[in-house]
Structure formats: structure tokens, C-alpha cells
Amino acid sequence: MTLLIDTSLWVDFTRSRSPAPLKQFIAPYVMDPTAHLADPVRFEVLRAARPEEARLLEAQFNTLPCLSTPADLWQQAIALGQACRQIGRTVLSLDLLVAAVALHHNAEVVSFDDDFEAIASVSALRLNRLNRPA
């Protein structure tokens, strides 16, 4: 099985102020041998990182396999977004693209983000929706 680790996990895992129990909860997912990255996730994480954090994150990301984002996935992301709108949900654009990448590669998205639940309800997206520990 291929896991696609979403931005929400990477942000909490790499943020210095995240509590240790949260990082320990996330660690098995980001360290899983089947964990993969996708370019939209890389973009989301690195665009918000400070320069010194970005260098460390790039080094870590370079150790992970990256799922490709073929150009036709943009159209699939649009279709997913339209399907979500039909059920009354507006989903962030990059989440739609991450879902399209996961569907293309038959990967399971691992995320704290509930936008993926809406996408999974209108598609064949495989999702492991996590809840942050209290």
C-alpha cells in the first residue's frame, strides 16, 4: 500500500511548538516505509516554512519517494471540486489536487484535514482521516 502523507501531518510533525505527544502520534505515519510525498504537499509545506526550516524540510523530503502529478490531474481536481460543490462542500484547491494525485496512484491519503472526507464521499479516494490526540 502507498501512503500519501498530507500537509496537515507534516506541519504538525515539523513545527517546533507542536507538543511531543502529537509528534509521537504522527511519527509512525511519516516514517512508514510506504510513506510518499506529492508535489502539491511539498509546495504547501515549503511555501510557509522559514528559510532555515525549508532547508531541513527539503533534506527530509528528498529522502521520500514523490508521487508524480501529471498535467491531466488538474482536470480531475476540477471534477472533484465540482462534485464536492454539488454536496454543499467547498474544498481547498490544493486538497483537490492532492486527492487527484492519490487517486491516480491508488494511494491512501493520511490527513487530519476534514476536506478529504468530502472528497472521499464523492470519489474512490482511500482516506485515513486522523484525529489529533487530546
Where are these regions (language model features)?
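Generic structural signal for small/hydrophobic residues in well-ordered secondary structure
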Residues: D6-T7, V45, A77, A102
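Residues at the C-termini of beta-strands that transition into short coil/loop
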Residues: D39, P70, N131-P133
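A general structural signal for well-ordered alpha-helical segments in protein cores
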Residues: L22-K23, R42, A54-L57, W74-A77, ...
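Active-site neighborhoods of divalent-metal-dependent phosphate/nucleic-acid chemistry enzymes
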Residues: P65-F112
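Acidic, PIN/NYN-like endoribonuclease modules and their adjacent C-terminal/linker elements
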Residues: M1-T2, A99, L103-A134
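General small-molecule cofactor/ligand-binding pocket signal
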Residues: H36, L67, N128
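A secondary-structure boundary/capping signal
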Residues: D6-T7, V41, F112
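Short, well-structured N-terminal submotif of metal-dependent ribonuclease cores
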Residues: M1-L37, L46-A59, A134
